[in-house]
C-alpha cells in the first residue's frame, strides 16, 4: 500500500489520506510507515513551505517524543520519513522552518488543541530547528532570530501551563542535548504556589 494525496473541498491537499482509510486499521506499524512514504516526484514538486507542512503532518512524527532524548526521536523520524529527508536537501529549508516557527501563534495553537495537547506543531518545529542537521546551516543572524523566537514562544507557553505542561522547553532541551550548552535552561518540573 502506498500513501496517496487527495484533495478536499477547500482545495487543500491531504498528503496522508491513507490514515483515514479502512485499510489503516488492518495494517501493522511497518506497513503504516511504508504507506506514509510519499513518492519522490511528489516531494520534489512541493515548494519548501509546503514540504515543511508535510513533515509536520507526518503521522509518525509523534514517535519522536517516545525516546530518551529529542535527538534520538528526531533520528528515528528522519530514518522513516522521506519527506523529512527531502527537507534536509532543500537549500531554503532553514528559512522555511524559521518563517513557519515565527508565524505559528501559541495562542491559536492552544485554542485548537485536543486532549493530545502536547502534540502541536510548535514542539515539532522546535525539535527540527534545534537539530544540527538544520542549526549547522544557520548563519549568525538566523541563530539569533531562532533564539529570539524561541524565547517569545517559551514565555507564551509558560503563560498557558495547563496546555503546554511538559513541552514549554522543548527547544532549549533539544539544543542542550547535542551542544552541551548550558546558557539556556528549561524547567523540567512544575512549580506550584
PLM regions and their residue ranges:
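Non-catalytic all-alpha helical scaffold/repeat segments
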Residues: 20-23, 27-193
